[in-house]
């Protein structure tokens, strides 16, 4: 079934590209690559990436366009690759100042969730956990809740880690909630 979907998508894309000029074709091809990178299994997404050897260009070619890119004063970079909104992983890819891979870290872990504390800003949380899978605003409370689906293990396996921000944009608490499955 998944293979059929890929074949149909590729056929549709090739038909759409037949009447395009080069610039339109390049944009369409890039969008198609971004789509396939977004649905690519993690094992293929990360295959063959070697710290100290793999270049930033090779990473971008294999993993696609990052959700966020942060440049640091020492010349290094961090690329954010969330596998959501319903994915269970977010990868932070660190590039050294020479443009080589230095580390890949899956950040949706209990250890990282434990680092979230009252008073943190939205940017500080985003730097640590990446893009949330869901954002809910509750104007009457007032609060904004960011949620990440993750593999927590235990009885339910998957759960949501939630960060609650007050009207000042700062964390005031965290919580967890179950993933509700169909009945």
Each PLM stretch: what is its role?
Residues 1-7:
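Bacterial N-terminal signal peptides that target proteins for export
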Residues 16-19:
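C-terminal motif of bacterial Sec signal peptides marking the signal peptidase cleavage site
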Residues 21-23:
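Bacterial signal peptide processing site
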Residues 25-40, 45-98, 120-183:
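A cross-family detector of function-defining hotspots
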Residues 46-47, 110-113:
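Conserved short-loop catalytic and cofactor-binding motifs
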Residues 103-108, 145:
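Well-structured core secondary-structure elements of compact alpha/beta domains
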Residues 105, 112-117, 182-183:
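A short, polar/proline- and glycine-enriched secondary-structure boundary/capping micro-motif
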């Amino acid at each position: 079934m998944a293979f059929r979907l890929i074949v149909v998508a590729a056929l549709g894309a090739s038909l759409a590209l037949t009447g395009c000029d080069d610039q339109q074709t390049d944009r369409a091809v890039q969008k198609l690559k971004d789509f396939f990178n977004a649905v690519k299994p993690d094992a293929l997404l990360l295959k063959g990436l070697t710290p100290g050897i793999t270049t930033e260009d090779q990473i971008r070619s294999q993993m696609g366009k990052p959700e966020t890119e942060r440049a640091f004063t020492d010349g290094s970079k961090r690329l954010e690759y969330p596998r959501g909104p319903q994915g269970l992983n977010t990868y932070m890819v660190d590039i050294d100042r020479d443009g080589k891979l230095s580390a890949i870290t899956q950040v949706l872990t209990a250890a990282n969730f434990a680092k979230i504390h009252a008073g943190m800003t939205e940017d500080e949380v985003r730097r640590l956990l990446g893009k949330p899978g869901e954002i809910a605003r509750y104007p009457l409370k007032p609060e904004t809740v960011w949620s990440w689906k993750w593999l927590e293990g235990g009885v339910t396996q998957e759960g949501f880690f939630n960060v609650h921000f007050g009207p000042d944009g700062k964390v005031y608490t965290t919580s967890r909630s179950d993933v509700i499955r169909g009945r």
